[in-house]
Design a protein with these regions (language model features):
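Terminal catalytic/cofactor-binding subdomain
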Residues: 127-233
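Catalytic or ion-translocation cores adjacent to nucleophile or general acid/base/metal-coordination motifs
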Residues: 247, 256, 260-276, 285-339, ...
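A glycine-rich phosphate-binding loop feature that marks nucleotide/adenosyl-phosphate handling sites
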Residues: 352-361
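Glycine-rich, often proline-containing surface loops adjacent to acidic residues and nearby aromatics
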Residues: 227-235, 314-321
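Extreme N-terminal flexible tails
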Residues: 1-170
């Protein structure tokens, strides 16, 4: 019965902290309106009150089933154009939006927790992003993950299976749909709260946190398709193309100064080998330590004029140079020197060319804050 599912989802919101006790009636009424219902029957409410209360764990486990039954009802009642994965995802995001705090409330709480510690702030925001179903826990569980021991360390291997397959009806509808440039891409700030359409995912349950990076406005969010713990995305407030340059190193280091428990990195600014959304300047990070970060330095290096910076070639199957210093300005200067040298480097005997038919050598910088032992 849909009324019982409405009570279940409201309890889910209360248990996870998305809904305050004072907002219980309000949330129930919003859900009734969404499903074109005029009332909550007294008998249903009385019977539900006798049930065993949810816990955080049982609430998480129940969410997928609650939403599926709500979606089945919506499909039968004609509240969705088609009963397909695409339309179900659009509608269940709308359902969850009834529980999600306003952006101003999320930002205010994040900033208050940040004053206690950056980790408390990100812990809150990561939990929120999962509880709102922006990160779909039940789909993430489908991902295949394992480790492999190699001479370079224990590597993480992931096959992402959480992205839903496009259904034929949605593909056909997307071709016929009016083309829109709003939002300009999947990263733009305008996605926050957006209802979506057949060719763009719904984001009513999506929240972003403003951060200042290198004296400019950026935003912080989590990836809906989590590849590792607290997989986050840091993106420019403006829809501007990715570009690896000297300023990039300053931006990356600025972020890890603000969130020292996170790493952050930039994909290359080239197609195929680089980021999947090159049209919007962004970085990716998280609360995780990959094998490359643990790999030892197999050969120490000294750069002229940078004798105060520790440097070395990392034991890794690809070319990796690790540099460290107490002053970030020194790291920025040396990183830029290495970048410029690499982009102009050619070794024909090793089949390395600075440029071939317009394709350039690429680099992927990734800093983290490490305390010296």
């Amino acid at each position: 019965m849909i009324q019982e599912r409405i009570l279940e989802l409201t309890e889910y919101g209360l248990v996870t902290g998305l809904v305050e006790p004072e907002d219980r009636r309000f949330t129930i009424n919003r859900l009734l309106e969404l499903f074109h219902l005029d009332e909550l029957e007294d008998e249903v409410a009385a019977a539900y009150a006798k049930r065993t209360p949810m816990t955080q764990e049982s609430a998480e486990a129940a969410l997928e089933g609650i939403l599926n039954e709500m979606l089945d009802y919506a499909a039968e009642d004609g509240l969705m154009p088609e009963d397909t994965i695409t339309y179900r995802d659009l509608f269940d995001t709308k359902i969850m939006s009834m529980l999600v705090p306003r952006p101003s409330e999320v930002i205010k709480k994040f900033q208050a927790l940040y004053q206690i510690s950056p980790k408390e702030a990100t812990d809150y925001f990561y939990k929120l992003s999962r509880d709102t179903n922006y990160i779909r826990r039940y789909r993430i569980k489908k991902d295949q993950k394992w480790t492999a021991d190699t001479e370079f360390g224990t590597l993480d291997i992931t096959i992402n299976l959480s992205k839903p397959e496009k259904d034929p009806k949605a593909i056909a509808a997307a071709k016929l749909a009016k083309q829109s440039g709003y939002p300009k891409c999947l990263l733009c700030k305008e996605n926050e709260g957006y209802a979506g359409r057949v060719n763009h995912p719904a984001r009513q349950n999506h929240r972003i946190i403003p951060v200042t990076i290198n004296h400019s406005d950026w935003f912080f969010q989590y990836s809906p398709y989590v590849y590792y713990n607290e997989h986050c995305i840091v993106f420019n407030a403006e829809h501007t193309p990715m570009k690896i340059e000297k300023a990039t190193f300053g931006k990356l280091l600025d972020f890890v100064e603000q969130f020292p428990h996170y790493f952050v990195g930039s994909n290359a600014d080239l197609p195929i080998v680089g980021g999947s959304i090159l049209s919007h300047d962004h970085f990716q990070g998280g609360h995780y330590e990959f094998a490359m970060a643990k790999a030892p330095v197999e050969k120490e290096l000294t750069f002229k004029g940078f004798e105060d910076v520790k440097a070395g070639i990392v034991k890794w199957p690809m070319s990796v140079i690790r540099i460290s210093a107490p002053q970030k300005e020194r790291l920025i200067e040396l990183a830029d020197k290495i970048l410029l040298a690499w982009r102009g480097y050619t070794d024909e005997d090793a089949f390395i060319f600075a440029e071939t038919e317009g394709c350039l050598l690429y680099t992927s910088p990734s800093p983290r804050d490490v305390e010296e032992s």
